Structures are given as structure tokens and as C-alpha cells.
Amino acid sequence: MFDPTNYNELTVTESSIPGLFVIKLPVHGDNRGWFKENYQKEKMEALGLPSFDIVQNNISFNDKTGATRGLHAEPWNKFISTANGRVFGAWCDLRKGDSFGRVFTHEINPGTAIFVPKGVANGYQTLDDNV
């Protein structure tokens, strides 16, 4: 089960793939569960996240550990997070340039989001049931 006590400060950190950012989200928990601002434009841009337009909003659900999706690359940016459980995320830069073929991996849980720039492939495998 996700423990929100370790997620109290918003941070935005660029990964080894240029333009791909790891976002640590403040999560506020109590006896009812937890709450988070999944995306807050002004705060995140002030910390270095690029401005982007929402082109499409997708939600996926996987009932079993080990479900794998990807790798997918679309001609738009992505903002990825989970509402429950953990996934092992993997990204590969498909853009022409010095970072072509570079791979980055990171675990995502409800306190973590990833900004994926267009041209970078995205995939994940669930580490828990009901993600």
C-alpha cells in the first residue's frame, strides 16, 4: 500500500534523457486516504517543467502484477502518473541527436509523475495488482 508520508515537497528533476522529467508530487494523507495535485501548471513550470498543451488524456487499468504496455511513441508530450500501486517505467529516446537510443528507467507510484517529451518511447510493467 502507498505511504504518502514520504511525499511532501514538489520537485521537478530532468533525467538522463533531455526533456524527460521526474516529478515528485506532494501527497496529503489522513485516515480517509490521500489527495494529490497531479498537475499544477504554474507551480511545475516555475520548477522547470516545460509548458505543454493537453492533446489527449488516457487512463489504463491493469488487474495483475506483471502486465506490460509499450513501448509507445506519439508525436505529442505525455504526463504519466498512477492513482494506485507501482509500475516500472522505461523510456527510450527516438529523436535524432546525441541522445538517440538513450534509455531511462524509474519506478512510478502515486507520489511520482513523469513528463515524456514527444519522440521518446514510453512503456511500463506493473509491480502491483490493481494499477
Region roles according to the model:
Residues 107-128:
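Conserved metal-binding segment of the jelly-roll/cupin
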Residues 1-108, 128-130:
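Non-catalytic, conserved peripheral segments adjacent to functional cores
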